[in-house]
Amino acid sequence: KEFECDGKLQWPELIGVPTKLAKEIIEKQNSLISNVHILLNGSPVTMDFRCNRVRLFDDILGSVVQIPRVA
């Protein structure tokens, strides 16, 4: 495995959840996450990997549409 990160690393149960609530849940469940970015689905992102970052991709209604994961 190329990257080793501690704590919970993905949240499939947050699909369909409002992104602001999902952000709070992620930060509560993994205190090592200090960067939660909310992005419209399809937005371009950098390819660098960080153990402290999760990207939340949402739709125009503000609900999570992709599994949030450390990236």
UniProtKB/Swiss-Prot annotation:
Keywords, ordered alphabetically: Protease inhibitor, Serine protease inhibitor
Gene Ontology terms: biological process: response to wounding
Transmembrane segments: none
Pfam family, one: potato_inhibit
GO MF, one example: serine-type endopeptidase inhibitor activity
Outcome when changing S63Y: In components B and C
Organism superkingdom: Eukaryota
InterPro entries in UniProt: Prot_inh_pot1, Prot_inh_pot1_sf
Outcome after substituting E24G: In components B and C
Effect of D59N: In components B and C
Transmembrane helix is among the record's keywords: no
Effect of D6K: In components B and C
Residues the UniProt record annotates as site (Reactive bond): M47, D48
Function statement: Inhibits both chymotrypsin and trypsin.
Family per similarity comment: Belongs to the protease inhibitor I13 (potato type I serine protease inhibitor) family.
Record's subunit section: Heterogeneous tetramers of similar chains.
Protein name: Chymotrypsin inhibitor I, A, B and C subunits
UniProt source species: Solanum tuberosum
